[in-house]
Design a protein with these regions (language model features):
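Active-site metal-binding motif and surrounding structural segment of the metallo-beta-lactamase
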Residues: 65-110
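Bacterial N-terminal signal peptides
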Residues: 9-16
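Hydrophobic alpha-helical segments, chiefly the membrane-spanning helices
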Residues: 152-154
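Zn-dependent metallo-beta-lactamase
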Residues: 2-5, 17-55
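Conserved small/polar residues in nucleotide/adenosyl-binding loops
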Residues: 141-146
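Portal/gating segments that form or line small-molecule/metal binding sites
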Residues: 94, 99, 103-139
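Active-site-proximal beta-strand elements of phosphoester/diester hydrolases
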Residues: 41-44, 58-62, 134-140
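Divalent metal-coordination and catalytic microenvironments
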Residues: 52, 83, 135
Length: 154
């Protein structure tokens, strides 16, 4: 009888644990209709980390590994890093989102951290890294012209 109870307990525990699945994280999103009628979806992860998806294109801004499991998300066409603070630049998140075709746009300091394989901008610069996107680097309160920190205005 003692072995029967132990056996039943083991089966019940196995069934209970096997029924637990890891639920995928959900994040707030907002979908907008652009002037040309296409849908643009913005997903907010946390702090300054967000994603923009439109017409199958994926743009990530300030991805930080603590805020999302970027390896499970669609790969990036473009990654924008606004400046080199720890809560805006995470090389592991950039690597998780990148492919050989991914373009990373950032300031000079962030580019050095990422190994220099980026398009760099400083306040006042404009750049069109893709035919569907134009970026203007603006000097904001977290910016310091001497350090070439930027904020990206889409």
């Amino acid at each position: 009888m003692k072995h029967s109870k132990l056996f039943i307990f083991a089966i019940m525990t196995t069934l209970a644990v096997s029924g637990c699945k890891h639920q995928a994280a959900t994040y707030p999103t907002d979908t907008l209709t652009t002037k040309n009628g296409s849908q643009l979806t913005i997903t907010f992860f946390k702090h300054a980390s967000l994603a923009i998806e439109t017409e199958g294109r994926h743009i990530y801004i300030d991805p930080i590994s603590q805020y999302a499991d970027y390896a499970s998300l669609p790969k990036a066409d473009l990654i924008l890093i606004t400046h080199s603070h720890y809560d805006h630049l995470d090389s592991a998140a950039v690597a998780a989102l990148s492919t050989a075709a991914t373009t990373v746009v950032c300031d000079r300091t962030s580019s050095e951290t990422l190994g220099g394989k980026c398009l760099t901008m400083k306040p006042g610069d404009t750049l069109a890294p893709r035919d569907y996107l134009s970026i203007e680097a603006c000097l904001l309160y977290t910016s310091d012209a001497a350090n070439d920190r930027i904020s990206v205005d889409l």
